[in-house]
From Swiss-Prot:
Pfam families: Herpes_UL24 (PF01646). Keywords: Host cytoplasm, Host Golgi apparatus, Host nucleus, Late protein, Virion. This is Protein UL24 homolog. The gene is UL24. It comes from the Viruses. InterPro entries: Herpes_UL24. May participate in nuclear egress of viral particles. Plays a role in the dispersal of several host nucleolar proteins including NCL/nucleolin and NPM1. Since deletion of host NCL/nucleolin negatively impact on nuclear egress, UL24 supposedly acts on this process through its effect on host nucleoli. Belongs to the herpesviridae UL24 family. GO terms for cellular component: host cell Golgi apparatus; host cell nucleolus; virion component.
């Protein structure tokens, strides 16, 4: 009996991890499409529409996604930063997302889901506090928006979105994006669809061949040592009101290295 319970717990954990990874990859594709077309898809609309309208996202200077961001005591599943201008005084939005996966979606008020919700809210509160302590210097107004998302393991449908009250901090949006990307420990794998390549050899006819991405997820990348940053006074009180929506209905400069394995995340959606 105990062995069976252990196996069940392990299988549930593996299923949750697989769902997280699939959702990460879907977010990259969906957000790229929204940035390009100015329209949110069904999956992103309940997450982003109230924070950054799609048309505003389309005209943003840059949008970045980072996954499994190592903040020390906490590691938010996803952090999305949106930059609306150039310079250290540019405004921006930083959305911290915590994912909770569900095997069954008919009843969202079960005891286990309520425990997931309480744990997720606590994780988001801690993540915001830790991020505020390591903000890069800058005078730009940045909105920190924590969001808890329940996702169905089948179909990756967004079932419920719970938002903590946004907090306003001051930082450099561009450097913040790079800093967060540098702390990311996961990169979504390349699409499993076959990609066509052209092999050209001198004196021979070019031959097309296809390669498939590895099925195994990308291994964790060890983050660089956190850069020294001035401490920021905590802006997050212990009790923060939440908004729940059912998806169905003066600082010294800090140098940040741009040469890292996840540099693509900071410029993935930047205008060409």
């Amino acid at each position: 009996m105990k062995r069976r319970q252990r196996l069940t717990a392990r299988s549930r954990l593996r299923a949750g991890i697989r769902c997280h990874n699939r959702f990460y990859n879907a977010m990259v594709q969906d957000l790229a499409s929204a940035k390009r077309n100015g329209v949110y898809g069904e999956r992103l609309a309940p997450l982003f529409s109230e924070l950054v309208p799609a048309e505003t996202l389309k005209t943003a200077l840059g949008v970045s996604l980072a996954f499994e961001v190592n903040l020390g005591q906490r590691r938010p599943d996803c952090v999305c930063t949106v930059q609306f201008g150039k310079g250290s005084d540019a405004k921006g939005v930083c959305i911290l997302i915590e994912l909770k996966t569900c095997r069954f979606s008919k009843n969202m008020n079960t005891a286990s889901k309520n425990l997931q919700r309480k744990g997720g809210m606590r994780q988001l509160h801690d993540s915001c506090r830790l991020l505020a302590r390591t903000l890069p210097p800058g005078s730009g107004e940045i909105v920190l928006a924590p969001v808890l998302v329940f996702v169905a393991q089948r179909g990756m449908r967004v079932l419920r979105v719970t938002r903590l009250s946004p907090q306003v901090v001051y930082s450099n949006a561009a450097v913040l994006s790079c800093t967060i990307s540098r702390l990311a420990e996961y990169a979504p794998p390349v699409s499993a669809k076959s990609t066509r390549r052209r092999c050209v050899a001198k004196g021979t006819k070019a031959k097309a061949f296809s390669t498939k991405a590895a099925a195994e997820p990308v291994p964790s990348i060890t983050p660089a040592q956190p850069s020294a940053a001035a401490a920021v006074v905590s802006l997050f009180p212990a009790a923060v009101p939440a908004n729940t929506t059912n998806a169905a209905a003066v600082h010294q400069p800090v140098a940040v290295s741009h040469v890292n394995p996840l540099a693509w995340a900071a410029s993935l959606f930047s205008p060409k």
